[in-house]
Structure formats: C-alpha cells, structure tokens
C-alpha cells in the first residue's frame, strides 16, 4: 500500500490527535454521548433517493481551507453556509473537522447540522474506532473511509464500528486497486471516486469514468473533486453518475447555495429541491 507523502504527514499527526482526544475524554464517555445524540438522518438514503430519480444528489462541502489551496473562504459561518446549501438543493452536507490541515472543527459540524435538516458526513481522516464513535457523538450521520489510508483489517473494523452506532459509510478510492479492496472489504452502497491524484494533486474526471465499469450496479458512485462547471456535471450525468461531492467551487462563491443551484439545477430548468426546508 503506497501512501502519498502529504497523506502520510496528515495520518501521523492524526494518530497523535486521537491519542490526545482519548486522554481528554475516554471512550466510555464518548459512547454515552453517542447514545444521546440526535437520531441519524439517513445520509445514504438521501443520496439514493435522488439518484433513483436521476436527479443531482449533491453532497455540498463546508471547508474553510486545504493544504494545497490554503484558505478558501474568509467569511466562514458554517450555519449560514448550511442554510444556503439547503435552499440551493443539496441532498447532504460534508463538514471538514480536521484542525491542523483543513482548519476544521467539530463545532463546525454541530453548527451546520443544527442549522438545517440535511444529513451530514464528518469529513476527516479516520484511523481509529474512537473517531467513529466520536463522529456520532457530535451529530454526524456518515463517516468517510479513505482506502489509501487504511489496510483491509482496519477498514473493516472501522466500518463495523460505524454500523454499530448507526452511521453510514462513504468509502473513497482513487484507482482500480483501491476500488477492488473497497468492494471486497465493505458492503456500503456509497463508493466515492476522488478525481484528485493524492501523489500529484492533479485532477482528472476521467478517473471516475475509467472506474465506472468496475462498480456493481447496486453501489452508488459519488464523484469527488474537479466538478467546476455545467459541462463537468453533464459529462457525469451522461454516464449515469448522479451523486457529487463538491467543495471548492462553492466555497469560493459569494453565495455557496446559489452557486450550487446554478451549477446543478438552474441551467437544466429543474425544480429546485429542498428550497422549502422543513
């Protein structure tokens, strides 16, 4: 398993962070908090229902910064962004909680989820079952498992922990080898294909298109990274990919939800979903 240098650095720091968190709050207490958290909102179902209707199932990301691009959004109010995304038609939210490399925070996830009715994925680097229980405790409805960061045994353990606390799993792959491992190890219906090469940081939508034929029809493909314009969306929809994770394009816009609506709904003349949240 070849782990990119940047990812190695993140994972090394993440191991330290998990140890620090565990020292502050023990697992038993986190489990208690998880049991008392609001019920999961059904992340996978929210995407699957849209995709069945061949409508855009957008996971809209709330991300202040990234290691490669620096700060993406100076005016960063998670609750405000969440409401904007919901009005714009997002199916789900993704909230970065990694502190050191993405300037994220657990509080951002809590604030975003409290401001809307959408399911939320905790976007972080999961390497320990403690983090999975913690995700449920802070209100997450889904977690991300990055195949390039995990061996098969740990990946299966983390997925089992997620299932035990009622969390959905989005598994992320970058190439055919990772895809094969993911399909063999996990039964989650959500398979994310990251179009960004973690070694070079180059983005190519061909990554999704190349891997599509290898994915069983009972799995939902989520294309991640590189969706910047209407042509990108249409390229995916022609190939029957209806689930998208988009962050940077929205974070750089004055009104993230309006940009979501424009990119995925306005130019197709579709009725905007979620414009009247409960």
UniProtKB/Swiss-Prot annotation:
Keywords: Amino-acid biosynthesis, Aromatic amino acid biosynthesis, Decarboxylase, Lyase, Tryptophan biosynthesis
Pfam families from the UniProt entry: IGPS
Record SUPFAM superfamilies: Ribulose-phoshate binding barrel
Known pathway: Amino-acid biosynthesis; L-tryptophan biosynthesis; L-tryptophan from chorismate: step 4/5
Species whose genome carries this gene: Pseudomonas aeruginosa (strain ATCC 15692 / DSM 22644 / CIP 104116 / JCM 14847 / LMG 12228 / 1C / PRS 101 / PAO1)
Enzyme class name: lyase
An annotated GO BP: L-tryptophan biosynthetic process
Entry's Gene Ontology molecular function annotations: indole-3-glycerol-phosphate synthase activity; phosphoribosylanthranilate isomerase activity
EC id: 4.1.1.48
Recorded family membership: Belongs to the TrpC family.
Name of this protein: Indole-3-glycerol phosphate synthase
Classification via CDD domains: IGPS
Catalysed reactions, as listed in the record: 1-(2-carboxyphenylamino)-1-deoxy-D-ribulose 5-phosphate + H(+) = (1S,2R)-1-C-(indol-3-yl)glycerol 3-phosphate + CO2 + H2O
């Amino acid at each position: 398993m070849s782990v990119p240098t940047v990812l190695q650095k993140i994972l090394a720091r993440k191991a330290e962070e998990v140890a620090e968190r565990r020292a502050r709050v023990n697992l038993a207490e986190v489990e208690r908090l998880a049991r008392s958290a609001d019920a999961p909102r059904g992340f996978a179902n929210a995407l699957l229902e849209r995709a069945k209707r061949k409508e855009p199932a957008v996971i809209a990301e709330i991300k202040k910064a990234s290691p490669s691009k620096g700060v993406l959004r100076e005016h960063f109010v998670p609750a405000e962004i969440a409401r904007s995304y919901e009005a714009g038609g997002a199916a789900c939210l993704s909230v970065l909680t990694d502190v050191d490399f993405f300037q994220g925070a657990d509080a951002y996830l809590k604030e975003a989820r409290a401001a809307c009715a959408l399911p939320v994925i905790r976007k972080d680097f999961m390497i320990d079952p403690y983090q999975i229980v913690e995700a449920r405790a802070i209100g997450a409805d889904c977690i991300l498992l990055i195949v390039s960061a995990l061996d098969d045994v740990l990946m299966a353990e983390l997925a089992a922990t997620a299932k035990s606390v009622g969390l959905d799993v989005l598994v992320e792959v970058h190439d055919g080898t990772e895809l094969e491992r993911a399909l063999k190890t996990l039964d989650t219906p959500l398979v994310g294909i990251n179009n960004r090469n973690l070694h070079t940081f180059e983005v190519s939508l061909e990554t999704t298109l190349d891997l599509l034929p290898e994915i069983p029809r009972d799995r939902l493909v989520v294309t991640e990274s590189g969706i910047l314009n209407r042509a990108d969306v249409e390229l995916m929809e022609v190939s029957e990919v209806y689930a998208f994770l988009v962050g940077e394009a929205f974070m750089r816009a004055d009104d993230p939800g309006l940009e979501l609506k424009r990119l995925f709904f306005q130019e197709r003349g579709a009725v905007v979903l979620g414009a009247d949240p409960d």
